[in-house]
């Protein structure tokens, strides 16, 4: 017995599915979650689903002739029991897959917690769950795991565009605190005296700078200079682009 259904995707989910309307031969005893993820849309991207103007949950078994509407996160007032992926509460904190090193550094530069460096997907998921982190990835497979709650599929492979994507998706501009995190390890930076870090400073730096910061986690020392000025200009340009929705 055939089970042909139609799924209509809305908003950002259209990018993931590749089209707005999909006609699918679902097969026997398939849930709407199975069908949505088969089309390339991880459950972490789905906020709610309707069938004939009624809300449904992920384990709804699809039936021949069904037409489902699938929505991304939005500000509509949805009954709590039908919110399929809850909104992340509090200051967004991330864990990135091993292919997103440049994005991790950009997020850290802006003061956003971005854990990075774990190769194994199982370990990424475990850390995300234990520390309530949002998984950022280009790999849809990791976000299709049932145990994963928070995650985002990056649409672009350009780190600067990825930064824009994540900023707009999670309103990160509300939490930007530039130069407060270590770009190497994600640790928090604290102000230190020149005397306290002299042994770690090149001679020219000792002669030129008086203000320093040190990573509480790895001990790396930071100071101003051309690199700092270039990053400051990048941040200024990026913030303007966010407000104008450009970049």
Show where each model-derived region lies.
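Short, polar loop motifs at secondary-structure junctions
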Residues: 10-12, 98-102, 137-142
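Short functional micro-motifs and their immediate structural scaffolds
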Residues: 187-193, 223
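Short metal-coordination and nucleic-acid-contact micro-motifs, chiefly zinc-binding Cys/His arrays
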Residues: 175-178, 208-211
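Short cysteine-rich clusters marking metal-coordination/redox-active sites
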Residues: 182-185, 215-218
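BRCT (BRCA1 C-terminal) domain core and associated BRCT-interaction motifs
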Residues: 119-133, 140-143
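Ubiquitin-like/PB1-type beta-grasp interaction modules and other compact soluble beta-rich domains
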Residues: 1-93
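Short cysteine/histidine-rich metal-coordination sites, predominantly Zn2+-binding motifs
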Residues: 197-207, 230-241
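Short, charged N-terminal beta->alpha structural module
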Residues: 86-116
């Amino acid at each position: 017995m055939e089970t042909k259904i139609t799924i209509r995707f809305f908003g950002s989910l259209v990018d993931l599915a590749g089209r707005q309307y999909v006609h699918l031969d679902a097969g026997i005893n398939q849930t709407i979650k199975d069908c949505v993820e088969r089309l390339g849309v991880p459950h972490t991207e789905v906020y709610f689903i309707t069938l004939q103007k009624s809300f449904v949950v992920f384990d709804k078994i699809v039936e021949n002739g069904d037409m489902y509407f699938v929505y991304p996160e939005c500000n509509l007032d949805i009954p709590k029991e039908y919110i399929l992926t809850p909104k992340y509460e509090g200051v967004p904190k991330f864990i990135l897959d091993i292919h997103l090193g440049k994005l991790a550094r950009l997020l850290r530069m802006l003061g956003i917690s971005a854990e990075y460096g774990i190769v194994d997907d199982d370990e990424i998921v475990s850390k995300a769950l234990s520390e309530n982190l949002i998984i950022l990835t280009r790999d849809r497979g990791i976000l299709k795991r049932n145990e994963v709650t928070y995650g985002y599929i990056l649409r672009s492979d350009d780190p600067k565009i990825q930064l824009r994507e994540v900023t707009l998706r999670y309103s990160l501009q509300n939490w930007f605190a530039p130069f407060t995190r270590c770009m190497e390890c994600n640790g928090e930076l604290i102000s230190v005296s020149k005397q306290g870090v002299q042994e770690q400073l090149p001679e020219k730096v000792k002669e030129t700078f008086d203000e320093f910061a040190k990573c509480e986690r790895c001990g790396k020392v930071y100071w101003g200079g051309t690199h700092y000025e270039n990053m400051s200009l990048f941040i200024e340009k990026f913030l303007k682009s966010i407000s104008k929705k450009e970049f």
